Amino acid sequence: LGAAFEGSSDDAELDRVEATYAPLAEAVRDLIDATIQTRADEEGILQARAVIEAVTQSLRREQSRPCEVSYRGDARPIPLANAVIGQCNPIAPPVVVHHDPDAADGRCWAEFVLGAAYEGPPGLVHGGVCALVLDHLLGEAASQGRTQPLFTGTITVKYLRGTPLGPLRCEAWVDRTEGVKAFARGFLSDAEGVTAQAEGVFIKPAWAREVP
């Protein structure tokens, strides 16, 4: 992925890279889920392991440094290797974030499914994964959809109850801004209601403070 995708701003090239590598990442996500849930016998596991190791070696023959962040025509960065939204990262669910262009508070949301790979307590999403998703959504709101360089200063998560594996929704917005700081809030919910709430402070780094 690194060799094929290094800081491109060409929409056609981005489309090509996504079309090539995103299905591979999705196949690996499916493999991860199958690995967790399989009850195959020892012979089946040994056969699967041999195939997986062979494929891994094949992919390692063509590698370079991780891909850089690239941009589409609207100047919004496309981090394909991001751990939350990266279409080409099999660790990412991936989450697709939507922004309300008419919202003054930078409101954004995402609906997604977390399966067995994200489990903590049996049947529930790991609390750290909940925090990961909330951190990202709050950051999306604070940074105006990844168009402003802001980084997490602090984030506080309040867990109201266990978050079940399955379909979820996350929503975030900016509560207020003070100079180089943006204060964001958000929540994670399932069909029964909110499972976790978060608030965070996002800070513009020193090198970006002269940028309008």
Enumerate the predicted regions with their spans.
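HotDog/MaoC-like acyl-thioester-processing domains
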Residues: L1-P66, R72-A75, T163-P164, D175-P212
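Hydrophobic beta-strand-centered segment that forms part of the acyl-chain substrate-binding groove
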Residues: A4-S8, A12, L137-R169
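Long amphipathic N-terminal alpha/beta scaffold segment
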Residues: E43-E119
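Short beta-strand micro-motifs enriched in acidic
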Residues: H98-D100, L160, W173-T177
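A short, structured loop/turn motif at beta-sheet edges
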Residues: D100-G106, G162-P164, E192
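Active-site helix/loop of acyl-thioester processing domains in fatty-acid/polyketide metabolism
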Residues: D105-R107, V125-Q148
